[in-house]
Amino acid sequence: MKQKILKLLGLATRAGLLVSGEDIVIDALQRKKAKIVFLGNDASSNTLDKFQKKCFFYKVELNTMFTSEELSNSIGRNRMVLAILDEGFHKSIKKCLGGVENEG
């Protein structure tokens, strides 16, 4: 399932529905555009703390299941933090993560 999520991240990048880099992801959170944030599990404790607080405040899921190298390889750029901006990609990723969507 991890590989499928990484492929979805690459597809979202090519579709222009993913942003990467600390400042841009924080901006997406503040503008309430980010649906889910991926942070490399090898990030510094300060970076992890910053994104935990931001994601908690803006009520966005933070996922740290990948290394920054895995995230970078999936999108073709050297990045440690990514945010999905599209609800469709978010739902597909949640399915892969085992999340059950209850709608209604």
What would you call each of these model-derived segments?
Residues 1-3, 104:
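Conserved catalytic alpha/beta core of Sir2/sirtuin-type deacylases, generalized to analogous enzyme cores
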Residues 4-39:
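N-terminal first-folded block
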Residues 16, 35-36, 61-63, 79-82:
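Structural motif
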Residues 30, 34-52, 59-61:
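N-terminal positively charged helical leader segments and presequences
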Residues 52-79:
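Mid-chain, well-packed structural core segment of small domains
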Residues 70-104:
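C-terminal structural segments of small proteins and small subunits
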